Amino acid sequence: IVINLKTIIYSSVYIQHDLQNCFQEQIRLQGQVRLLEHRVKQQQLKVVQLLEKKEIQYSDRGDENSVIDLGGKRQYSDCAEIYNDGHKQSGFYKMKPIQSPAEFLAFCDMSEGGGWTVFQRRSDGSQSFDRVWTDYEEGFGNFVLPNGEYWLGNKNLHYLTNQGNYTLRIDLTDFEGERRFAQYARFGVAGEEQSYEMSCGEYSGTAGDSLTGGFHPDVKWWADHRGMKFSTRDRDNDNYEGNCAEEEKAGWWFNRCHSANLNGLYYKGPYTAKTDNGIVWYTWHGWWYSLKSVVMKVRPADFQPNIV
């Protein structure tokens, strides 16, 4: 009996030792699983970023059928020059502003007097505007369809507006079919060294003055977008303790954070979210209504349409 008891005791000790080893091995394997999950998430993020870059480089940059042929006789600095040279059809044209090192493609809106260079369009939510700094710098989106969503690129927007005095016009449409607009004098975007800081002058229009924070002083001090640098989720230049671009899912000239965010998520009208991250124009529909379509476009302030 004594021998059997000793055998049982020794066996229980070995079993406890084996159990302890199993627990330690389990802890080690759990740590490896967490490490692998972290690495997988990192790789997934890299894949998403590479796909976004690939979209910028290869997709939707226009083909020969979507670009209006001007015959190669001269280079144009913007859509105003194209219009006054007799090309009255809205569509995609190649242009080269004075300081731009290369030609680029942009949509020319020949309505409202003609000569408008479109640098942003929202129409159906088909493009993600929750992008990193280089995406917004170089431009992205659909450069084929006449109503395709795109961002022309902060570099190109700087080259355009640095040529002289430009007027900004913003056309807005809600899901009830109502259309309004906002227009700003002396619109400009600084260069890369100033993080593409935005400036604008006097407002006119029917949508309300959201770019300067609206009319209410309790909103204006933290929501005025004038003089703000551009921010993206990976380049935070706002005045907020957190990261506006990350919270609002967009690149924009955020303050603390916004009274206008036309690069927000595409909802269909009224929406509910943790933050007011829709396509927002506060002075028209407030922060919790996302607009159906937006067009942002510029034209020289001294533009005189050639009717010939």
Which residue ranges define each predicted feature?
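Extracellular beta-rich globular recognition domains, centered on the fibrinogen C-terminal
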Residues: 67-226, 306
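C-terminal helix/juxtamembrane-tail motif
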Residues: 276-308
